[in-house]
């Protein structure tokens, strides 16, 4: 299922005073993610390492705000900070795994919250694993086959995350699913 992989070095630019103020004034924690808003990865798995923080000169600095970093939303609707220990690799489930497992696995909604200070960047590495473009995005057939996003499983999606069923159908391949996903987000 995951013969296609690529890595990205992700750089999150320092927040402006305006972005910090908007993040601080957000009505809820769910609305306070200025570095990267809520989304699901549409691939199969995403491997992540602990982020590092840098100043404007590129020197490594400690995280200046313990509330800054990666957050996930679990199936019960709880927003949790994902603290990745040094030297560890963690994985997030993507929507392709959700589809190809018939909903047994569920994609992990996640976002990145910036610090409440200017002049600090965030750096991390993500390893994205995904099907080949022509891979069928069909649920398993046979006994136990079911809808990958049953009723009630969308109730805890964060604002801005389009429901899977609004972008996917059982006749698509991975490339078609990718295009529909990009169109829904952008």
Predicted features along the sequence, with ranges:
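C-terminal flanking tails of non-heme Fe-dependent oxygenases
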Residues: 1-186
């Amino acid at each position: 299922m995951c013969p296609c992989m690529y890595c990205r070095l992700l750089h999150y630019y320092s927040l402006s005073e305006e972005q910090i103020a908007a993040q601080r004034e957000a009505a809820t924690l769910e609305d306070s993610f200025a570095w990267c808003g809520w989304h699901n990865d549409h691939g199969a798995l995403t491997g992540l390492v602990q982020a590092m923080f840098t100043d404007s000169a590129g020197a490594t600095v400690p995280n200046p705000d313990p509330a800054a970093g990666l957050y996930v939303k679990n199936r019960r609707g709880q927003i949790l900070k994902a603290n990745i220990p040094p030297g560890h690799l963690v994985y997030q489930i993507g929507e392709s795994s959700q589809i190809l497992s018939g909903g047994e696995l569920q994609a992990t909604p996640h976002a990145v919250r910036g610090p409440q200070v200017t002049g600090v960047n965030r750096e991390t590495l993500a390893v994205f694993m995904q099907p080949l473009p022509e891979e069928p995005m069909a649920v398993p057939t046979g006994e136990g086959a079911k809808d990958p996003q049953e009723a009630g499983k969308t109730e805890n999606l964060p604002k801005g995350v389009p429901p899977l069923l609004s972008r996917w159908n059982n006749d698509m391949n991975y490339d078609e699913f990718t295009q529909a996903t990009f169109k829904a987000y952008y």
